[in-house]
Swiss-Prot record:
The keyword Metal-binding does not apply. Residues 1-15, 78-83, 154-164 are cytoplasmic. It is a multi-pass membrane protein. This is CASP-like protein 1C1.
Amino acid sequence: MGDVEIPPLVKQIVRGLRGLAFLATILATSFMAASHERAIFPFDYKADYTDLMLFKAFLGANIAASLYSFFFVCLPPKSLLWRLAIVLDVIMFGLLVAMDSAAIAAAYLHKHGDSQAFWPPICSQVPTYCYRVILAISIGFGGVFMFLLIIIISISVILNPLLV
C-alpha cells in the first residue's frame, strides 16, 4: 500500500484544528496557573491550584498538549513525523481526557465538599478561585474536543481509500 493522498482542504482543516487545540490548551494552562485566592473570613485560607496534585497534573497535561500542538502546527508538510501524528494525537487525547476528568472531579469536591471525608466545600469562601478552575477545565475540554475532531478526520482520511 502506498501513501494516502490527503486533499489540501483537509490538511488546512486539520492544521486549523491543531491551532485551536493549541489555543484551548494554552488558555486552560493559563487560567489554571492563575487560579489562587485568599479568604480571611471565617479563617485564614489560601486556595491555590498547587494544593491538589490533580490540578498540577491537569496543568502538566495541558502544557504537554499545547507544546505538541504548536510543534505540529509549525511542522513542514513534507516531514516524515506526520506519519506518527495519528498515534500521538490518540495519546494526547487520552491524556487530556484523563486529566480533565480528574480535575472536574476535584472541582466538584471544591464546590460541594464531602461530608463523609470531612471535606468542606470551599467555593463559597473563594469564588474567584473556583470560577477560574472551572473555566480552565471547561476550556481544557474544548482542547479535548479539538483533538477528537482531528482523530476522526485523520482516521476517515486513512480509511477512505479502503472503503471505496
